[in-house]
Amino acid sequence: MRILIIKLSPIEAITSSMFRTLAIARGLSEAGHKIDYLVVPMNKLNSASSEKEFIKELNVIRTSKSEVYEKNVINAENSFKALRKQILRKIWHSLSVYDYTYLIAKKIKIDILPVREYDIVISSSDPKSSHIVVENLRKQGLRYKRWIQYWGDPLSIDITQKSIYPQWVLRLIEKKLIKNSDKIVYASPFTLSKQKELFKDYKDKMVCIPTAYMEEEIYPATDNQKFIIGYYGNYTARVRNIKPFYNACRALGDKVSVAIYGDSDVKLQATPNIAIYDRGIVDEHKRIADLLICILNSSGTQIPGKLYHLAGTNKKVLVVVDGEQQQEMREFLLSFDRFYVCGNSQEEIENAIVSIMKDNKEFLPLPELKYDYIANRFIE
């Protein structure tokens, strides 16, 4: 089949949503399907990952840049322009439910595509403007047999949403976005349940398919003098609470060596046993780590894609559950027989780490989350 995947992010970017979409693309490509992959170019705000070899098998199509956004928000070099950039970004994100790629989505022309007819079109968010591209191209003559929407955070229950609009307005916008699709895929069973409740007219085309990991990562056994722990991901205060984990690691002292990588508005102080880094490449640290940490969101229904990527390793993984559905999430995660799980309190985390340090259990990547298996489920 010929398949068009639309993901208005740079294909080189280090984001969970890009990784989960690329996992689908890889699985479909290796199954023999021809993939056109529509993305936006890199800009100065993006962090680049190392390019995956299989990307060369995709026909990557890059849109033009948003000149208005590039000029006024991205390319600010002196202090005045930098301040203006910060103000303009805040204004934009408060007045719009989309990011800057909305401008690209509305102006995109069908001539950018090599063909005008596909067996399947997949639009993947975030950003949510990826779905707008399909509607725009439909009006210009795009034809397809099925349109599958792949959602990360739904619009109206997105805990990272900074828009000034009330929930009922966001739901109207979201309803308009999903109504013409043939299939809607969510990565969390809790998100699926909530969306079926909110959009009853479209519940029959909604499904939950877990996020796929893109590569199996098998590491040799470690022989560290100290127990090495890695946390890799952003930890913005309004999304997840990293303080209990941080405090637990401080309390454990020289029993553990901890590295925290990620962007945040929370200022954590480095200690003799805890190193703090900005977001970046973590491959080398992951190789030597004894335990990987995933902290779930403080509220909402989403499960971070990072959790599933960690399931593609043979490392021990501790998932710290939080929010109003802790018990349900705990039961769901334990059903995989792959993760250690605890609540988000210093005491629980500290006790869990001490217990894991004594546990000799070994793990392998979960086959039911591998990219080829998930990609096949995706287009069923």
Model region roles, listed by residue range:
Residues M1-K65, K183, C249-L252:
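N-terminal subdomain of nucleotide-sugar transferases
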Residues A23-I24, L103-K106, S129, L155, ...:
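Membrane-proximal helix-turn-helix segments that form the acceptor-binding/catalytic region
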Residues M214-E217, N224-K267, I276-G280:
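Conserved catalytic-core segment of nucleotide-activated headgroup transferases in glycan assembly
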Residues N43-K106:
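A conserved catalytic-core segment of Leloir-type glycosyltransferases
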Residues R287-E368:
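Catalytic binding pocket for nucleotide-activated donors in carbohydrate/polymer assembly enzymes
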Residues F190, T211-A212:
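Carbohydrate-associated surface elements
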Residues K179-D204:
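A short, active-site helix/loop in glycosyltransferases that binds the activated sugar's phosphate group
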Residues I108-S130, Y144-I148:
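Short N-terminal targeting/anchoring amphipathic segment
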